[in-house]
């Protein structure tokens, strides 16, 4: 059987931000795509890192892919 997907209690917006991280986009660029300020994106990133137990973007992307929260792009 496949391992169960962990959702880490991420909000829909946090999942949206996580899905944009593999592109290497800056917080400002992600904000432009989602019509949010850079500060708001940085808050979402801080929450993502905390919930995922990630130290940085690369680790967040790795955890996201391993847990099927994002697909390889």
For the regions a language model picked out, list residue spans one by one.
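Recognition helix of helix-turn-helix DNA-binding domains
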Residues: 24-59
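Intrinsically disordered, low-complexity segments enriched in glycine/proline and serine/threonine
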Residues: 17-19, 41, 45, 71
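Flexible loop/N-cap segments at domain edges
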Residues: 53-55, 60-71
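Short, locally clustered residues in the helix-turn-helix/winged-helix DNA-binding domain
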Residues: 19-23, 65
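Regulatory hinge/linker segments at domain boundaries
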Residues: 1-20, 73
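Acidic-residue sensor for enzyme active/binding pockets
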Residues: 14-16, 38, 66
